[in-house]
């Protein structure tokens, strides 16, 4: 039963069917299923298939966008419930301000990462896309963040990750936050070059990295 729901959810993401995704996500909540697994084995597995198909030219952008929107619908239902359960089980592991850098409106990877952080017990403040360095820092100061996570999906916007770190230095705040970077064109070499505290290739890597950095 559980596997079939997860398989159906994965397929609904691939099909970009928002209604079915909403229905199945709500069903997972109502039936008290493992919601972290629902995100990982349903939503994330589906979007991974879509990502691979897109890279190999088997899916076109409009279909990819439909799948991305369907995933947002699922996350909107599941994330608050995961966060609620996390809160009832005790304090959060830390606060993470997350966003896609200025000039970049890609958010699939960021959304998956945010969901995984929430599932792992972190309080996530997702700023969305096209966020300036000042925006990241202002929110981090406001909420008392431990980590700033900056995603860039374009080679032309990667530089904004560097600018974020430079802005923190400029404001004498560099030691106040750990900065994690990620996104398609980024790498460990890039993270080292710009002085980031870490780089994550996948959402799971990001959680592992945050745990390591904060000693959780």
Swiss-Prot record:
List, for all copies, the residue spans of the domain called B12-binding. 93-216
One biological process GO term for this chain?
methanogenesis
> Where would I find the B12-binding N-terminal domain in this sequence?
1-90
A GO molecular function assigned to this protein is: methionine synthase activity
Q: Which Pfam families match?
A: B12-binding, B12-binding_2
A cellular component term, taken from the record's GO annotations:
cytosol
Q: Which InterPro entries match?
A: Cbl-bd_cap, Cobalamin-bd, Cobalamin-bd_sf, Corrinoid_p, Met_Synthase/Corrinoid, Meth_synthase_dom
List of residues binding methylcob(III)alamin:
106
**Which PROSITE patterns did the record assign?**
B12_BINDING (PS51332), B12_BINDING_NTER (PS51337)
Keywords of this protein's UniProt record, alphabetized?
Answer: Cobalt, Metal-binding, One-carbon metabolism
Q: Does the keyword Glycoprotein apply?
A: no
Outline what the protein does: Probably harbors a corrinoid prosthetic group and acts as a methyl group carrier between MtgB and MtgA. A methyl group from glycine betaine is likely first transferred to the corrinoid prosthetic group of the enzyme by MtgB, and then transferred to tetrahydrofolate (THF) by MtgA. The methyl group may then be ultimately converted to carbon dioxide, and its oxidation would also provide reducing equivalents for anaerobic respiration. Thus, may function in the pathway that allows anaerobic methylotrophic growth of D.hafniense using glycine betaine.
Q: Which family does it belong to?
A: Belongs to the methylamine corrinoid protein family.
Q: Which NCBIfam families match?
A: pyl_corrinoid (TIGR02370)
Instruction: Tell me the protein's name.
Output: Corrinoid protein DSY3155
What species was this sequence derived from? Desulfitobacterium hafniense (strain Y51)
């Amino acid at each position: 039963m559980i596997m079939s729901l997860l398989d159906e959810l994965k397929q609904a993401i691939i099909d970009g069917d928002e209604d079915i995704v909403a229905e199945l996500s709500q069903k997972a909540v109502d039936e008290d299923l493992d919601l972290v697994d629902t995100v990982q084995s349903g939503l994330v597995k589906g979007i991974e298939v879509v990502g691979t198909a897109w890279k190999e030219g088997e899916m076109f952008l409009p279909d990819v966008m439909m799948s991305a929107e369907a995933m947002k619908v699922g996350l909107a239902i599941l994330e608050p419930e995961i966060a609620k359960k996390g809160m009832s089980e005790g304090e959060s592991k830390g606060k993470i301000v997350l966003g896609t850098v200025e000039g970049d409106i890609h958010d699939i990877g960021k959304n998956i990462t945010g969901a995984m952080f929430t599932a792992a017990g972190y309080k996530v403040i997702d700023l969305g896309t096209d966020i300036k360095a000042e925006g990241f820092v202002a929110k981090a100061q406001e909420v008392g963040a431990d980590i700033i996570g900056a995603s860039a999906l374009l080679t032309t916007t990667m530089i904004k990750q560097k600018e974020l770190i430079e802005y923190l230095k400029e404001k004498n705040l560099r030691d106040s936050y750990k900065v994690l970077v990620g996104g398609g064109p980024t790498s460990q070499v890039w993270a080292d070059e710009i002085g980031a505290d870490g780089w994550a290739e996948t959402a799971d890597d990001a959680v592992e990295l945050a745990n390591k950095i904060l000693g959780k």
